[in-house]
Amino acid sequence: MERLNSKLYLQNCYIIKENERLRKKAQILNQENQQLLFELKQKLSKTKNSSGSNQGNNNNNNNLSSSSSASG
């Protein structure tokens, strides 16, 4: 019985250490993920802002061409 307890204790210690290792790894991955998400949002925001003015002009041009072809 004592031998079984010792074996289970050692397994438990191993599991606890492995759990700590995985928790640290998950924390690092989460930080990397948050950083990548932040960078992606910045890039999307920049491209949206820079293409937003061009897209507005394109929409106006499309509306004009649609209007002229519909009335023509």
UniProtKB/Swiss-Prot annotation:
Record's note on what induces expression: Up-regulated in response to increased HD-ZIPIII activity. Up-regulated by REV.
Gene disruption: observed consequences: Zpr3 and zpr4 double mutants exhibit homeotic transformation and ectopic meristem activity.
Origin superkingdom: Eukaryota
Keywords associated with the record: Coiled coil, Transcription, Transcription regulation
Feature: compositional bias, Low complexity: 49-72
Subunit structure: Interacts with REV.
Name of protein: Protein LITTLE ZIPPER 4
Taxonomic source organism: Arabidopsis thaliana (Mouse-ear cress)
UniProt gene name: ZPR4
